[in-house]
Amino acid sequence: MTVSSAPGKVYLFGEHAVVYGEPAVPCAIERRARVTVERRDDDRVRVNADDLSLDGFTVAWGGEGDDAPELDVPTNLLEAAMGYIDGAVAQARDAADAPDAGLDITVESDIPLGAGLGSSAAVVVAGIDAATRELGAAIADEALAERAFQVEHEVQDGQASPADTFCSTMGGAVRVQGEDRRRIDDVGSLPFVVGYDGGAGDTGELVAGVRDLRDRHVFAADTVEAIGDLVREGETLLRGEDTPLDELGGLMNFNHGLLSALGVSARSLDSMVWAARESGAYGAKLTGAGGGGCIVALDDSEGSKTALDYTPGCEEAFRAELDTDGVRRES
């Protein structure tokens, strides 16, 4: 039996713009997905996922004559949850040169699904790592991140960025711009507060919407480039000896405004952003694809957390420190 875990993430800056070659800075947070894998004697795959904010399910498939898993859950749940796990299994089998290996897989996560916190990336990273090691092969972090990205890229119909999977694999604050992917070293404390509206945006649709806007309007393309310029300034601040939280927060506020202009915010997200700002946060913005899900605030006091607890439409609020660990080989 082999266990791996990987962290979720928030975007400090740069979501959506990263799809077009601009830099982004995602940061790993101390909420994780854990995947336990045990090899079977046959070629079937059995997945138990009873802690994915989805009511839980168990599914088994594989073997001659089985074209798809059978389970008593809605089709969209099957597609959302199983697409990533199925891709992780395929990547692990390929990495270990074990195309017919059967696996028992248990998935646990304290990262809300579809909320902009990198839940799918964390599950895929931890899943590939645990399954590959259970099948007797080793995998380097860089190769793991690339394989995990290939899974997300396929499941999201080519709309995915490598930022989520790279951040989940490496941990800490990272910079991603095309093929240039690296950790930002010696980043100080980043006191994040996350607000969650209980919803989930459709990443593929939101990314496609920004693409359409960018293709039709010069000002939208300029907005994407402005996000890239903002990220570069933020990265410079992160690399300093004393991280100026007030300046970082100001850039987060600006970034949220640009994302709103691109049409990816939502009323619930804006309400949480303003609640955090008015309670004294250095800055706040949506994180991830948008359309619903989460916001992230930068606040070293209890103000934002308390304000979000009482904000209509905010189902959960929690503190989330920067997690300097990426994938963990737990057993």
For the regions a protein language model found, what residue spans apply to each?
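C-terminal nucleotide
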Residues: 3, 7, 34-79, 83, ...
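Short alpha-helical patches at coil-to-helix transitions and adjacent helical residues
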Residues: 9, 82-85, 121-128, 167
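FAD-binding core of FAD-dependent oxidoreductases
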Residues: 17-21, 26-30, 118-122, 160-171, ...
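DPxDG-like acidic metal-binding loop motif
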Residues: 28-31, 115-141
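Glycine- and acidic-rich phosphate- and metal-coordinating loops
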Residues: 89-112
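Contiguous, small/hydrophobic- and glycine-enriched helical/loop subdomains that border
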Residues: 100-103, 133-154
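Short pre-catalytic strand/loop immediately N-terminal to key active-site residues, enriched for Gly-Thr
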Residues: 108-115, 282-284
